[in-house]
Amino acid sequence: MDEFFLMNSFDLAGKTVYLRVDINAPVNPLTGEIMGIDRFRAHIDTIRNLRNSKVVIVAHQSRPGKDDFISLRQHAQILSHLLNKRVQFVDQLFGSQVNRAVSEMSDGDIVMLENSRFYSEEVDLTTIESMESSNIVRSLSPLFDYFIIDAFAAIHRAQTTLVGFHRIKPNIAGTLIEREVSMIERFRKIREKPKIAILGGAKIEDSIAVSENFLSRGFVDKILTGGVVANAFLWASGFDIGKKNREFIMKNNGDYEKLLDKCRAILSKYGDKLVMPTDFVMNPSGQRISINEKIPDDQILADIGLDTIVEYSEIIDGARAIFMNGPMGMYEIEDYSSGTREVFTAVAHSKAFKLAGGGHTLSALDKLGLTKMIDHASTGGGALISYLSGETMPVLEALKESKKLFEG
């Protein structure tokens, strides 16, 4: 972690600090209420460590055009409840109201600004130079002594409030980013074998990218698949997965033929290292079926079957390091939760180093009471996948450059 400024690199007491977090959360489409607060909890240590500073919080919620693209007023209330402390909400990201609120702050005060993605400069600008010339950066820069970036779940985004200040004043990695990077690097450096990945859920494109990257670099020895991800690989390998399962993949993936071609390429190169289910539980019938049998057109492959659970559990038991992202099936429905429950329980009881990521994965672990048995449950979804896949992380690069510019 020598590459970044950390929060103990400076005396922040009495200083005015900008704190960029990621508290992007699911929203109930009927009531407009925030439904999950895991990401809020993840930032509490960082905020409490700034108890003697004036803290101004910047964050985003969703993106333009989405139903959950809402104000952060509710987010401020949730943080206030978690901290047992007033969090003042200002319905601007920059401007006279923000200037006034910051000028009136005392040490220990917390202010939260409006959704950064309400402003086109947050999402439209693509170069650091254009960001530095933006109203966001020119208006906010003079207000702060230090900029703390703690939005791990957004480290793969090059957006103005994340990277636009790093050449202007010192940018510091927050407590959450420090912990996330430390634990993920620990996982990456494990050399003991076998090292496995468990990829499930419905995000086929992400899982294909991870599979290709992990296997081509020899990063893992085996990948166990479940959910829609497994269905895609099975379809690509020539199995008839049934009409409803084909339609789901076709409907939810634009150029699905291209995805299937990528699956075929991975299977051609690394077929012996990619493990697919051999049996399933169907919805709505609830019956078990082998992948070699004819799958009725009206049935969904809703969970992995007993034979697959046994096979996967044996592989997990012998592993030295495990990365898990995505459930094995429709775990939210009790009748189709066995695969996820048994596989995740096997991981939790494994002696391996265990890294988990993705919203549905963390939700399932929490529901099963297994979170504390996982070495690291990451707040990153797409960010974690991108990081583990070896992609450049704009936020981490900006933090590194900021240290080079301002140290000594």
UniProtKB/Swiss-Prot annotation:
GO molecular function terms noted in the UniProt entry: ADP binding; ATP binding; phosphoglycerate kinase activity
EC category name: transferase
Recorded metabolic or biological pathway in which this protein acts: Carbohydrate degradation; glycolysis; pyruvate from D-glyceraldehyde 3-phosphate: step 2/5
EC number(s) given by UniProt: 2.7.2.3
Broad class of the protein's primary localization: cytoplasm
InterPro entries given in the database record: Phosphoglycerate_kinase, Phosphoglycerate_kinase_N, Phosphoglycerate_kinase_sf
Keyword ATP-binding: yes
Subcellular location: Cytoplasm
Regions crossing the membrane: none
Assigned GO CC terms: cytosol
Binding-site residues, ATP: E332, G358, G359, H360, T361
Family: Belongs to the phosphoglycerate kinase family.
Protein name: Phosphoglycerate kinase
Encoding gene, per UniProt annotation: pgk
